[in-house]
UniProtKB/Swiss-Prot annotation:
Signal peptide: none annotated. It comes from the Bacteria. It comes from Methylibium petroleiphilum (strain ATCC BAA-1232 / LMG 22953 / PM1). This is Large ribosomal subunit protein uL18. One of its GO terms (molecular function) is structural constituent of ribosome. Belongs to the universal ribosomal protein uL18 family. Part of the 50S ribosomal subunit; part of the 5S rRNA/L5/L18/L25 subcomplex. Contacts the 5S and 23S rRNAs. Pfam families: Ribosomal_L18p.
Length: 121
């Protein structure tokens, strides 16, 4: 019997294989209880082209005194920041790799904010 983490990792492996066959950059998401992290990784998987997270000093300052990065507002902010950084790096289109997490809540907020900021997936 697999635990929740192993189940999530198993789902993410299947997704990464499908994305690798597409030969496009991928937007990966990792969600912890306290923070959310997003990275744009090159199509061959060898290089991180852009990244953003709620653990960054500027983001924590913008989120306020509590610095809460575990909510949908913080995820939306990270989605906007990752889209801006990806576009600055010359990336217009990516494949969304949710890392085995359900497309709901913070993951969905990040994805929708990235789309609104001009990143296509």
């Amino acid at each position: 019997m697999l635990n929740r983490k192993d189940q999530r990792l198993r789902r993410s492996k299947q997704t990464r294989v499908r994305i690798a066959l597409q030969k496009v950059a991928r937007l990966t998401v990792f969600r912890s209880n306290l923070h959310i992290y997003a990275s744009v990784i090159s199509d061959d998987g060898s290089k991180v082209l852009a990244s953003a997270s709620t653990a960054e000093k500027e983001v924590r300052a913008r989120l306020g005194a509590a610095g809460k990065g575990g909510n949908t507002e913080a995820a939306a902010l990270i989605g906007k920041r990752i889209a801006e950084r990806a576009k600055a790096a010359g990336i217009e289109s990516v494949a969304f790799d949710r890392g085995g997490f359900a497309y709901h809540g913070r993951v969905k907020a990040l994805a929708e904010a990235a789309r609104e900021a001009g990143l296509q997936f």
